[in-house]
Amino acid sequence: MDLLKDNIPQLVKKLAIPASIGTLFQTLYNIVDTFYAGQISPEALSALSKSFPIYFIIIAASIGVTVAGTSLIGNSIGERDENKVLNYFTHIIFYGVIISIIISLFGLNFSEKIFQVMGSSNEVTNLGLQYTNIIFYGSIFFISVVSLNSLLHAEGDTKTYRNVLILSFFLNIILNPILIFGFLFIPAMGIKGIGVATLISQLFSFIIILIKVLKNNRIKNLTKEYFLLKFIYFKNIFFQSMPIIVSIC
């Protein structure tokens, strides 16, 4: 696929269809988690339902990073400026790490208060924190996946991320009952198991995307100079991503 030369209607099909399928499986991900939470107890289901608005902070950040990384790297590819392509790629990774640390600190410190503001009982709050704390500890994997994928997406490769979402979805289905109810030497974790299953699935996604990116021809041109932070790239990424993150939140 050549984004600069191929027929536009064909490009739209090649890009949009895999992305749409990936989004479908991402939505099914949450439906599966909700189903298994209902198998634990009504309180666990309530806790998970009230966790989603908090968890959505990570989703919003991921979308913001995706849009910023894809658009800025894509524009640089269109300009045939390989220096900017690699600079934006390294800076979007650094930016993603910084955002994930900020989100983790916020979530771990304020999730309990958010549950209380939503009128949750002590039991629902405690169950919700068991889930959200795991998610926030692993937020770096959620955001790093989309940071790395921004290069692939900008090049027109939406199939890799689609395939990763599908595989992680089925991995999540397998892990959920094992970690929630226990199996052989694995203890029953309850609602915490849903968080652990999600985290393992995201770690799996991160490893697959990382391997794919490391095989990319552009990565061979990376030198230590591209890892020296430059304000202009951070500024452009910030102003591309932050309005999206704020509007979604």
Q: What is the meaning of each model-derived region?
A:
Residues M1-P18, I73-I140, A188-M242:
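Short alpha-helical transmembrane segments in multi-pass integral membrane proteins
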Residues A19, T23, T34-F35, S71, ...:
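Transmembrane alpha-helix boundary and packing residues in multipass membrane permease domains
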Residues L28-I31, Q39-P42, S76-E79, A154-E155, ...:
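Helix-loop interface residues and adjacent transmembrane-helix termini in multi-pass membrane transporters
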Residues L45-L105, F142-Y161:
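Small-residue-rich hydrophobic transmembrane alpha-helices
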Residues G96, L152-I178, K192-G195, L199:
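Alpha-helical transmembrane segments of multi-pass membrane transporters/permeases
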Residues S120-S121, T125-G128, T132, S139-I166:
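Cytoplasmic helix-loop-helix junction between adjacent transmembrane helices
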